Every structure is written in structure tokens, then in C-alpha cells.
Amino acid sequence: GALISLTADTAAGRLTVEAGRSNFSLATLPREDFPVMASSEYASNFAAPAPVLRRLFDKSKFAISTEETRYYLNGVYLHIADAEGGKALRCVATDGHRLARIDAEMPEGAAEMPGVIVPRKTVGELRKLLDDDEMEIAVSVSETKIRFATPAITLTSKVIDGTFPDYTRVIPQGNTRKMEVDASDFARAVDRVATVSSE
């Protein structure tokens, strides 16, 4: 491949890129204009294995709403919740028609974590960082921001400023009618029926 040469002319506001016989001159902006995420104290700092976070977000993101008027549903609600085995790290997403709720064991240090709504776009970008099964992700959470840090990349995002609805009210309680089905058989049956469904 060709050797790429970058030359910055801050006075003229130009960046020259040269590679082989190609030459590009790009307009630039002053570095002072780049938005800076102000450093702040995080209420909670903990580490979670990449596979755990991957499972939480992969199994909940399909239910994120795309309706902009209900902006508080445009993300995944990440919080600490009471579960059967004690406290759990929980992801919840809903679009008003579907609801996904996924639990994982609460990581050490996460007990005081405030509940936050992680935006849909942040979930998508975070997912790209979670493919390494051996990686530990450092998570820092405040009322306004969330940060995910790997050894090579740090992703910081504002959280959605809103109140996630009380999803527990729409989950049936005390239901005595329960059944277990083979997941692959059930998926195939739903797939066949879906071909003639208009909704």
C-alpha cells in the first residue's frame, strides 16, 4: 500500500492528505470548537465481562422504540433490580407493544448505580466493542452520563433525560398457566404463521 502523508496548516484551516499520486486538501475547524464531555464524578463504577453486557443488550435492543415523541423509550433502561436470586443488573426495553427484560448477576460495585436510559445509538456503538469474550468492560454511571471503557477504547454517552415507565405493571403476576416449549420448534411455528399475518 501507499504511504499516507498528513500535513496540517492550522493558520489556513486545511489538512493535506497525500497517498501515492492522490492529493487531497480538506477544510478543518479549530480544535477549540470540538465539543468536550466535561469530566464529572460517577455515582457507580464497576466491571462486567463483555459476554454479559453483550447478552443484556442483544436480547433487549429489538424492543427499543423508534417513535421520537416518546423519547424516553428510545433506549434501553439499565438499572439494578430485585430478582429471584437477589439483586440483578437488568436491561429493559419496550416500544409499547413488546417488552424485553433481561437479568444478569449484579457486578460488584454496582449496587448504588442509578437507573439510566442508554440511547439506541449508544447501544449500537457499544455492541461493536463487545465481541471479545475475554474482555472486562469498565462501566461508570452517573445521572446524566454513562461510560464504557475497554483497554483500547472509551465510549462516553449522555443518557436520555426522562423517566422510564413502570414496566412491572404490565407484566402479569401470579399467573398459574405456564408451559415450556422447545425454542427452535416454537420459532419455526411462529415463522410459518407470520407469513400470512398482516401485522
Protein language model annotation of sequence segments:
Residues 1-199:
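Structural preference for solvent-exposed beta-strand-turn elements
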